[in-house]
């Protein structure tokens, strides 16, 4: 009887402690709302061409991580099919930033023809051109290829959140923003925040695994959203 009573008292005590912790957390959260994001403002010079934001970018991004009102999307591929090594870049996702989840732009829709031509003039060939959720026509209209296309897009890029986009140089993020705005999103809530090469803060995670001269990639570290096109219903 005494053991049972002691057990009950112990359980009640821990319940009170946990309820107190939850109450304090809730009170703190309610009394410390997240600060407003700065209004979008394009950077100057070359960064303006890539539509990189002046206020939220690779130099300031660590100040805006872990926000509950924001989703973070890296729109690079794990292994890009294009010959980026001809520009002294890499095809593989060598590192990413904590809190960002990878959703490749290349699986959302096609690359604009002018971009393909531009890259060809820079000796970069082989951009991904296979299955995509949407088709991009010459008039920049986005036509869904699958019954589930819009549902997937809205899940990955929710309407009720701010969206931070990043990629390797700015173009993939730029194209993603154009697509979202053309379909259903508020342009003022979508930020092209930087190109990863200039990131120098504290939340970078490397995927490179180098043993002597042999390099492999720990893609298992990456929070990656795979789109299984074989399971989707074609229109």
Residue positions per predicted region:
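Rhodanese-like catalytic fold shared by cysteine-dependent sulfurtransferases
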Residues: 4-62, 66-67, 71, 78-235
């Amino acid at each position: 009887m005494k053991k049972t009573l002691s057990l009950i008292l112990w359980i009640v005590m821990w319940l009170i402690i946990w309820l107190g912790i939850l109450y304090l957390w809730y009170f703190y959260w309610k009394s410390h709302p997240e600060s407003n994001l700065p209004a979008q403002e394009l950077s100057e010079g070359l960064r303006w061409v890539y539509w990189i934001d002046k206020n939220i970018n690779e130099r300031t991004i660590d100040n805006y991580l872990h926000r509950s009102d924001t989703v973070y999307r890296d729109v690079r591929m794990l292994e890009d099919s294009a010959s980026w090594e001809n520009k002294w870049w890499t095809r593989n996702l060598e590192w990413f930033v904590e809190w960002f989840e990878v959703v490749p732009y290349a699986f959302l829709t096609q690359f604009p023809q002018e971009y393909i031509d531009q890259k060809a003039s820079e000796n970069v060939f082989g951009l991904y051109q296979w299955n995509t959720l949407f088709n991009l026509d010459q008039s920049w209209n986005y036509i869904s290829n699958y019954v589930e296309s819009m549902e997937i897009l809205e899940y990955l890029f929710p309407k009720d959140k701010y969206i931070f986009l990043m990629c390797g140089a700015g173009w993939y993020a730029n194209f993603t923003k154009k697509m979202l705005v053309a379909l259903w999103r508020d342009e003022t809530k979508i930020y092209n925040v930087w190109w990863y090469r200039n990131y120098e803060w504290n939340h970078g995670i490397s995927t490179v695994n180098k043993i002597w001269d042999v390099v492999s990639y720990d893609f298992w570290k990456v929070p990656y959203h795979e789109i299984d096109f074989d399971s989707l219903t074609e229109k």
